[in-house]
């Protein structure tokens, strides 16, 4: 699945999270894994995109950490080489994803796709659907764009406060 460059760039209220430099060439390789990368700014605003590569979850997460560009109030964040203080497994996702906490206003979630057709809407409701992906049976996903937009708007206002 191809996503435009703007799916890898998220900006709100003087916080910029930029993953446009994270590029992979896709090859037919039996070792390839599919991943979803969620970007989050100000705890309320989300975007996500897909990547296919032959890296492990852990290696890809470190690469994302190294490639991530974070600008807060026009000051660029320099990633310390000691990444272990910023990266953790996501236990609520059965360790199928990892969280990169860059600062209190920006984080990235790198998740291994559990099913080939696994996709999520942009914005916060898509991330909520992602958080329920291990539920059995899987809860239905709202497909009406008007309902989804209203839910996103309401959640973004509540979470941003």
Swiss-Prot record:
InterPro entries: AcMNPV_Orf57. Pfam families: DUF918. It comes from the Viruses. This is Uncharacterized 19.0 kDa protein in LEF8-FP intergenic region. It comes from Autographa californica nuclear polyhedrosis virus.
């Amino acid at each position: 699945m191809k996503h435009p460059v703007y799916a890898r760039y998220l900006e709100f209220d003087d916080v910029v999270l930029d993953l446009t430099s994270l590029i992979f060439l896709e090859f037919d390789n039996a070792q390839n894994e599919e991943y979803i990368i969620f970007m989050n700014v100000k705890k309320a605003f989300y975007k996500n995109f897909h990547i296919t590569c032959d890296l492990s979850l852990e290696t890809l997460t470190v690469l994302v950490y190294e490639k991530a560009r974070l600008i807060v109030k026009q000051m660029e964040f320099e990633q310390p080489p000691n990444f272990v203080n910023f990266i953790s497994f996501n236990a609520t996702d059965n360790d199928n994803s990892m969280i990169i906490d860059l600062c209190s206003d920006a984080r990235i979630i790198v998740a291994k796709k559990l099913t080939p057709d696994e996709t999520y809407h942009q914005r916060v409701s898509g991330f909520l659907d992602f958080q329920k992906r291990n539920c059995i049976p899987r809860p239905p996903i709202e497909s009406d764009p008007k309902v989804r937009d209203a839910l996103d708007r309401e959640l973004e206002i509540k979470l941003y406060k």
